[in-house]
Amino acid sequence: MKKNDFMDKNLKIFRMGSKYLMPTYSRLPVVFTRAKMQYLWDANGKKYIDFISGYGCLNVGHSNKEVILAIKKQVGNIIQSSNLYFNSAQVELAKKLCDISGFGQKVFFANSGTEAVEGAVKLARKYSRDKYSQQKFKIISFNKSFHGRTMGALSATAQEEKQKVYQPLLDGFDYANLNDIESVKNKINSQTCAIIIEPIQGEGGINVSDIEFMKEL
């Protein structure tokens, strides 16, 4: 080992991480040890501006004072109660989300976007099976979309590069072109139960859905 390698804390921790963590991503050789709002500091104390923001989940900043206080308060009361019971914070947040959004009257809490998509796929198929028939199970998504990396969400992700090593995927997904209502109509048949769409696609550029297309959809 070179002297510089020994002194570089980033490299030391990076090598340890490469040894013990699954290589699900190609990581850059920098290791962050603390963060505050938009700033990050690596193991050597170098300061960075965070332009990734946890892919959006840290949009109020790292170590936000209000978030820290809310977490401490809740941890001091109750952390988890399982799905066998309600807890008061869960119920209050669900009501607030319904009131603010004005969209729907039910909330489904999940840990990630891919879990939200899995839940949506299951709900759409169960509803269609109960209301119509078992044959109404197909879901239309859009080319260049990204919905997650679990098997159901990956099946809705219309990107061959991301799907090919995990074949066979979940059956019953068709892919249309964004902002092309005719391509959607051509995919709809008696087996279609739902359409899943990102109003703004973020993979391979920023692809924005036209307002008229969304209205027709």
Question: What are the functions of these language-model segments?
Answer:
Residues K95-A194:
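PLP-dependent aspartate aminotransferase-fold enzymes
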Residues P29-I52:
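Active-site and channel-lining beta-strand-loop segments
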Residues I49-I52, A194-Q201:
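Short beta-strands and strand-loop turn motifs
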Residues I200-L217:
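Active-site core of PLP-dependent enzymes with the aminotransferase class I/II
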Residues K19, K47-Q134:
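Glycine-rich loop-to-alpha-helix module at the N-terminal edge of alpha/beta enzyme cores
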Residues K2-K36:
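Active-site-adjacent loop/helix segments that line or gate small-molecule/cofactor pockets in enzymes
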